[in-house]
Amino acid sequence: MFTGIVNGIARVVSINKKKNFHTYTVNFSSILLKNLKIGDSVAHNGCCLTVKYINCPHVVFDIMKITIANTNLGVLNIGDYVNIERSLKYGDEMGGHIISGHIMNTGEISKISKLDKNYILWCKVKDLSLMKYIFYKGFIAIDGISLTINNIIKNEFCVSIIPETLSSTTIGFKKIGQLVNIEIDFYTQIIVDTTKRLIKKDISTLFK
C-alpha cells in the first residue's frame, strides 16, 4: 500500500524489451535506497513493481505485459524520470490517501493552466467507465500523486498542483498529449459499485 506522497524521482538508465515484459533499471538516490531489499514493493508513477535486483545506485524491476498495456511505463525511454514511493510501513504518516498501486488506466493531459503559483492540470479519461468514480473534491492518484479533483466536464477532470508537488515530482515536466497513470480512490469504487448493485437488486425484486 502507498499514500500518494512521492518520496523522490528516479531516472531510467536502461530498458530491456522482451516479447511479453520489459526489464528496466532506474537510478535511486540514497534516500530511496535506504533499507531497500529484493522483493520489496515500490510504486513507479503510481504502479506497484517488485524489486528484482539491486546494484547501488541501480535498481532493477520487471514490467509485465498487462502493465505495459495499461500504464505509461510501457512508453518510457532511457533518460525519463519516474515518481517513486516506497511502500507504507506501520507508524508512517498518512499524508495523502490509501493507494494500492494498481493502475486502472491512463489519462491524457488535455490542458495546463499556469498563473502565478496556480498550476491547473486537465486530464481526459480514456476509459469512460471510470468517470462514475470521479467526483468533485474526491481523491484521485495521477502518476502516483495523491490529488483532489477540482472540476469535472464530461470525460475530463482537473486538479490543482501546489509548488511543493511541482518541485518534487515529475508532474511539472508533463506536456499536453502525454499519458498519466490513473488510480481512482478504492473506497469510492466500493461505495459506487455496492450502491449500484443494491439498487439493481431492489429494482429487480419489483418485477418478480
Swiss-Prot record:
GO BP of this protein: riboflavin biosynthetic process
List the molecular function annotations (GO) for this entry.
Answer: riboflavin synthase activity
Superkingdom of the source species = Bacteria
Which residues make up the binding site for 2,4-dihydroxypteridine 1? 4-6, 146-148, 160-165
Q: Where does 2,4-dihydroxypteridine 2 bind?
A: 48-50, 62-67, 101-103, 137
Enzyme class per UniProt: transferase
For this record, an example GO cellular component is: cytosol
Q: Where are the Lumazine-binding repeats?
A: 1-97, 98-195
- Name the UniProt key words of this record, in alphabetical order: Repeat, Riboflavin biosynthesis, Transferase
Catalyzed chemical reaction(s): 2 6,7-dimethyl-8-(1-D-ribityl)lumazine + H(+) = 5-amino-6-(D-ribitylamino)uracil + riboflavin
Cystines in this chain: none
Please give the Pfam families that the UniProt record associates with this protein: Lum_binding
* Assembly behavior: Homotrimer.
Write down what this protein is called: Riboflavin synthase
Gene name tied to this protein: ribE
